[in-house]
Every structure is written in C-alpha cells, then in structure tokens.
Regions:
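Extracellular structured ligand-interaction cores
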Residues: 24, 35, 68, 83-85, ...
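ATP-binding glycine-rich phosphate-binding loop
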Residues: 1-49, 64-67
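Surface-exposed alpha-helical segments enriched in charged/polar residues
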Residues: 28, 54-58, 73, 127-130, ...
Length: 142
C-alpha cells in the first residue's frame, strides 16, 4: 500500500499507478486528482530545493501552465513535513521534443514536416522560456 501524502495546505494525496521512474524519483497517477500526477523523490531533496519547489508551486499561474508542466503543489510525507515531491498537471498526447529536432526521428514521425512547422515549434519553445524568465525562475550566476 502506498503512503498518503499531504499538500502544504493539508489535503490528502494518494499515489496511484507508477507512470515512470528516473534518477531523481518516480511519477505516479494521483487517485484524488485525475488531471494531475505526483513526482516523488527517492530521497527528500536538500532544503534549498525544497524552498525552490515551494516558490515554484506558489507562483504557478495560467500563463506558466499554458506552456509547461509546472509544480502546482508541494507534497509532504506528513502534515508540515519536508517536501518529498510535487503535483503537476498530467500531460498526454504530446511528443518528446527530440521527435521534432532530430532529423532522423522527424523523418519517421513527421515525414511532411516543413520549415514553417519547425519555426512554429521554435517560437513556442522561445515563448516557454520567456514565460519562465518573466516569472523570476531563472537565476543568473556569475
């Protein structure tokens, strides 16, 4: 049985089916929120990353969510506990970007794709990055 998790506001979240796993953690369906998924870290992230995730969730808005699968709520092992993951919108029906930018993949998947489509994709990617920058989520380190 998977553990019950809690949002920062105390809502219960129960992880469902595992959708994928990577080096940092795993992504699960959420039983209570069918349009969202939970990324749960294998080990709790450092305090600085926990703070960053809380800031990201607090500043999620329609403009960001139009472009990116963005953290909408932090997840905790207990009420008021450490951040061990986050909720984000469930994305389906999308292609990994390498299917567009890799010529070999593009020829397989989109054989009639022309430059106008590639420019359209590039413009959307640029808009995504601009939106993230406008929301203050990029730090310049010198």
């Amino acid at each position: 049985m998977k553990p019950t998790l809690y949002t920062a506001t105390g809502e219960c979240v129960t992880p469902g089916r595992e959708l994928g796993k990577g080096g940092e953690g795993a992504v699960y369906d959420i039983n209570e929120f069918v349009d969202s998924v939970a990324k749960i870290y294998h080990t709790p992230p450092p305090a600085l990353k926990q703070d960053k995730l809380a800031f990201m969730a607090a500043t999620a808005d329609a403009q960001l969510l139009n472009y990116v699968a963005w953290p909408q709520a932090t997840l905790h092992g207990g009420r008021g506990g450490k951040v061990i993951g986050f909720m984000m919108p469930k994305v389906s029906g999308k292609e990994p970007i390498h299917m567009i930018y890799s010529p070999a993949h593009r020829r397989q998947r989109y054989p009639h794709c022309a430059w106008d489509f590639l420019l359209y994709v590039a413009r959307n990617i640029a808009s995504s990055f601009a939106t993230v920058h406008e929301h203050g989520h990029v730090e310049w380190v010198t």
